[in-house]
Amino acid sequence: MNNKHNLALAEQYDQKPLIKTSMLPEVGASQWHAFLTLGFSKTARGTVLKTSDHKGPLYVQKPFYPEGRDTAHIYLLHPPGGLVSGDRLTITANLAENTHVLITTPGAGRVYRARKDKTLQHQITQLNVAENSLMEWLPQETILYPNAHTRLENRIHLANNAKFIGWEITCFGLPANQEDFAQGHAEQGFEIRQNGRLKVRERLVIDDSSRTIFAAKAGLAGKPINGLMIAGPFDLTNASHSASHDELIDSLRKHCAQHNSVSGVSLVGEYIFVRSLHHDSEQVKQLFIQCWREIRPALINKESNEPRIWAT
């Protein structure tokens, strides 16, 4: 896949923002923008990182292949470690046909306190997955500092028979320092399109008008950590497959029941959702890893192989 092909893919999947842009100040021309665009192809050497274009302090190391050459493990690096006022990060991964890519991060992402002018801190992740390919998006948690003003968008575009497993773990405030997210503004969007059709749309807005959601039982139930895991699409047309999916969901629910958190599992259309609320982001991550170990072989018939960086 060459740069021209990457550009064509990006233009093909260009969508309007998940979140209305009128709600927060826009990024001005004087603010810092960084981007990373990755292109993956299938060759005789397996899944290879064919192109890597970037601007600013956002890049990746060479791929790792702990599972063999067909699956590339990618570590996404952002040396500043977080977003300050006016930052805009755009991460794009274009997967050509028959590729398998797992992307993770070496540490937590951070969105720091905004300046007094409350200029937007914005991150867009766009994952374009071609036919018969798999994208695993498994970053570490994102910490939203009190008084951050941020918009975080995840856009996933799946072609025919493409698969996705991903999660996001968000820490509101600094609970270890007894600092909650009493001030600030956060918007999160998670969207999956399958062959151009919208299949999943999740949206969360935290501002002064909705801050009661933190304490509400139907909201975050007093927990500062909010985790969401999504996997699919699963084939529900075959009766035997449906039975095995029921067994998978039952097993995932047992993991949630044994976990000291407010967690649950649901099947929405062709996608499995795992949600978790907790006081400890590491506990949510461990629950999601347990679920991933079962979801992965059920979805793609391949056992889990944890990125080595998770053990450091």
UniProtKB/Swiss-Prot annotation:
Swiss-Prot/TrEMBL keywords = Chaperone, Cytoplasm, Nickel insertion
Query: Would the keyword DNA-binding turn up in this protein's UniProt record?
Result: no
Q: Which domain of life is it from?
A: Bacteria
**GO CC aspect terms:** cytoplasm
Which compartment or compartments is the protein found in? Cytoplasm
Instruction: List the Gene Ontology MF annotations in alphabetical order.
Output: nickel cation binding
User: Which family would the database say this protein is a member of?
Assistant: Belongs to the UreD family.
- Protein name (Swiss-Prot/TrEMBL): Urease accessory protein UreD
The species is Marinomonas sp. (strain MWYL1)
